[in-house]
Amino acid sequence: MDTISFRLKNNFRITSIANFIPEFSIRSFSELSQKERILSKDPKTNYLRKFILHPLVDKEIYCPSVEVYEKANANTGTVDYEMVITIHSLPKFHLNNNFEEIKISDRNKIISLTVERLFTIGISVSEESIGQAPVSVIHFCKNIILPNNIALRSILSDLSHTDMGKAYDTTEDVHRQRDKNNGKVVHLRCGTREWCFYDKIDDLCQPKGKRVDKQKTIYEKELLSTHNFENLEVFRYEYRLNKSQTIRSELHTLLNKSYDEKITVSDLFTEGLWKSVLVKAWKQILQRPENQLALLSCDSSLDLLLHIFRKAKAENLSAHSQNKALWTYGLARAIKDYGAKTVKSELNKIWIKKDNRLTNKLGIATELVDDIPVSQGISCITEQLERFEFIDLTSFKRGI
């Protein structure tokens, strides 16, 4: 895991109110202005006041981000305070770097450290409250050290041609992001779900404005200068769930919980959960028909064409079979060259509201190429995710 955000409602105490901007203060319902009381009746009002923590601590101390929201309920005549705590990188928080990965067994240490760091910045909360706090954001992640014969850039190039449906980024948006980072980062988004892929080591060597990981610790700088990472490429895979409803939808079955039950900080440290989530999210990309076409491994356009012809001929020699072979090749070649989203978007500009027909055609097209493997890089990532080996600093010394 990497980023985690969770909420505490009233079960905390702030001892250093001046650390917040504006300065933190508590009010009763009777102290609210007339306008605030009116706002408290509106269900669209998320909060009345927001306090952001700006602690005066040593920059070497990796602290959580904290925001407090003041919310009023006109029906009960009460004012509540909800604290949102975000740890932007659990490995950095616990290990001072995120080359390494945390373990399931680190749960108690991380919860204790959270209580300790919060106390340092003027917030008193119990370990039990942290453990049972509902989670609102969680980023699952995996570092995969690539063998020398696999180029990370080729993997990112393949993934940039994939698509996850109409709600996701267009391929054009993905290419803009890739160009901004010299082709070193690929994002796929779906509302509050997001996939992110990049080179972990190269990212840390970039200027802050171009990095995915904006906060570089002093220890990470030392590691970069003292360890020989020069010949290593590390594929960073992050699957980000950015809303509590999305988290419940993804995790309630894996945790044997009902959808209505909250997912807590302690729940996230369940054995096997991280692998299950990341493997499932990866397969969601690979199993879509348009992505199967995008990720095909073929030496040349002619090889792909001849393979499709032979497969179609084996089915039957009718004119229908020939037509199927021709449009299958056209779809496959266009998607490999320009990306699934671009092809689908351009088709939809001409044949409006024909999504179901196109989806059906894409599914049929995969039947003629289902015996062509995915690219070597994609296959390598799939294999490494299934193995899900723990990564620490010794892993970088030995490689794979």
Please place each PLM-identified region on the residue numbering.
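Residues in the recognition helix of alpha-helical DNA-binding motifs
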Residues: K354-L358
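Helix-turn-helix DNA-binding segment
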Residues: V343-K353
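Structured, helix-rich domain cores that form ligand/interaction pockets
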Residues: M1-Y338, T342, L362-I400
